[in-house]
Amino acid sequence: MSTRRQETRSRWGCMTCRSRRKKCSEGQPSCQLCTERGIECIYPDWTAVKFSQTRQRRRQLQDANIGRAVARPTLLPAQPSNHETRFIFHFNTILASLISFSFPQAGTPNPFLQHVLPRTASSVQVQYAVEAVAAAHLYHLGAESGDRATQLHSKALNLLAVELSRPQLDETSRMNLLASSLLLIYYEIVLGNSASNAWCHLQGAKVLLECHRTTPEPPFFSFFRKIFQYFNVMLALSLERRPLQINGDPGPDFTDHMDTVFGCTATLWPLMHRLADLIGRACLGGDISNESKILMDRLHSWSIESSPSTDAYTEAMVQIARSYKYCGLLMLRQAGASEAPEYSTLQDEQIYRSAFDSVLRVCVLSLPMATLTWPLYVVGKLASSTSDRTVILHIFSQFLEKHHMMVVDGARAAVQAHWQEPQPGWQQSAPVLLG
């Protein structure tokens, strides 16, 4: 008895042969069986079949991975597990870009990463200061406990005291102490703590700056000096006192056109230093009427233009500079520094509107806004209409959401408290940290 040979059916045969369970010759355009029977030979669309099978396989894999942690690709290095290293990592990847107005261009590194972060490898003092600032920022983000930030801050303060008690310090040690003192000011800014504490650190930085005798100035020293000058003006305005002077120098002398520390032009900053000095003298009861008129004229004549080809970062710097100019004029007017008849209420309204527009433009650009606290505070205090106040609160909210620094929340609370006063005056009832 002969055994019937089992035919091997092809997976790629025509539809007729597959339905009749016959082996297909797979001839094109018609197989042998369909040709003999005189019927239409139809082959399936294998592209659709393959896609369907692939999609089904993908679904099976997805179902198998439900509830299982899947590592997603990332452009950033994995976050270190060590706490201290994690704080350095946060400062490097997040915080440094929030407190600097460096241009994101090739060959223009962030100055904090260039002049501060490398010092953490050789100086425990700078390391603790950087970690304290980063931990404070993470605390505000809800990613770290407040106790950890406090511990690191205490370590940085203790090391600072120990180092300063030494009878002699070399140049490297002094620069590390200077970097640490300035970072501790940022610690107060991030947590919105005390303008007085920040002023104490500023006074320590002043002494260290005065000890420097090297000429020409190395780049890191120029960077530290600019940070000092920025906080010198902002803290003086916060506390309504006169700025500090370095070796009797009446004010900053910057040569660069655009500055990466405070996003302002160098030609305007000496005028802001003069403004802080006059406001401080006025709070002490001094007569500044003549000098304030001169400063107002200089502020009115100062200008900076932007072109259609200006990139967003440069445009933000321009608008920040303009907001400082107009808020400086508003402060002089509100402080009663000028009673000249040529300054009318209409002019005040025009200056206010210009300051308001510049602050709003910076917000719309959605770039680093770290130096916007003071002009936003000034414009906010003068906002009287419901619409303007609504916009101001929106800018504060966006500012806080972008930077997550309590100094912004403190300024917002002070502005809202000012609005609630029955007859709000310009004088601050308590120091407001601005920086």
Sequence positions of predicted segments:
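Internal amphipathic alpha-helical repeat/solenoid segments
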Residues: 2-6, 69-173, 350
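Cytosolic regulatory protein-protein interaction regions
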Residues: 108-111, 115, 239-374, 378-401
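Acidic/serine-rich, low-complexity amphipathic helices located in mid- to C-terminal regulatory regions
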Residues: 80, 85-86, 93-95, 99, ...
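Charge-rich, intrinsically disordered regulatory segments
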Residues: 1-109, 119, 407-435
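Start-of-helix signal in alpha-solenoid helical-repeat scaffolds, especially tetratricopeptide repeats
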Residues: 128, 178, 222, 226, ...
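Hydrophobic/aromatic-rich effector regions of fungal transcription factors
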Residues: 113-119, 129-142, 152-195, 205-211, ...
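Short coil/turn connectors between adjacent alpha-helices in alpha-solenoid helical repeat scaffolds
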Residues: 140-149, 188-201, 238, 282-285, ...
